[in-house]
Amino acid sequence: MSDERYQQRQQRVKEKVDARVAQAQDERGIIIVFTGNGKGKTTAAFGTATRAVGHGKKVGVVQFIKGTWPNGERNLLEPHGVEFQVMATGFTWDTQNRESDTAACREVWQHAKRMLADSSLDMVLLDELTYMVAYDYLPLEEVVQALNERPHQQTVIITGRGCHRDILCLLYTSPSP
């Protein structure tokens, strides 16, 4: 290949790369789901949220199926302005009271909806949300609607096993041209 042909080919590659970079500059939020049977979903989500806080972003956290015990993530992030809303009933398999679990979930969900509507929040972490949908504590349609109506720039992180496919369908993907 001649130097001239090589230079022309590389120029075309550069134009494609530049176009992709320009497209990626669109400031829009995404939905990230950490799901599956293994460990580390909440840890990965908090790592992402911590990084966002480190870059000056405003983050809100809603924890479903968590207890009242102190945790390191909250101890670290609350002093940096991260709002936490925690269901604080403990694990639902311990309480075994569907009515009170559903009521507690609905109460915390109201805070989650407020955060999802708040354009000042760059990121909202919905820890263990998948269980709330799977256990029918929250209507799937209401969750999908709140996710769809969130501010354009807001990123949402969802954790938990068995994420419903209708939530997974909201994930933004961009196939390569």
Predicted regions and their residues:
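Conserved P-loop
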Residues: 33-39, 43-113
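Phosphate-binding/switch loop-helix module in NTP-utilizing enzymes
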Residues: 97-148
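Loop/turn-to-beta-strand initiation segments
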Residues: 120-122, 152-157
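Short, structured coil segments at secondary-structure junctions
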Residues: 80, 169-170
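Extreme N-terminal, non-catalytic leader segments
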Residues: 1-29
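Short gly/ser/thr-rich secondary-structure transition/capping motifs
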Residues: 14-17, 105-110, 156-159
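Short, polar loop motifs at secondary-structure junctions
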Residues: 160-164
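Conserved small/polar residues in nucleotide/adenosyl-binding loops
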Residues: 172-177
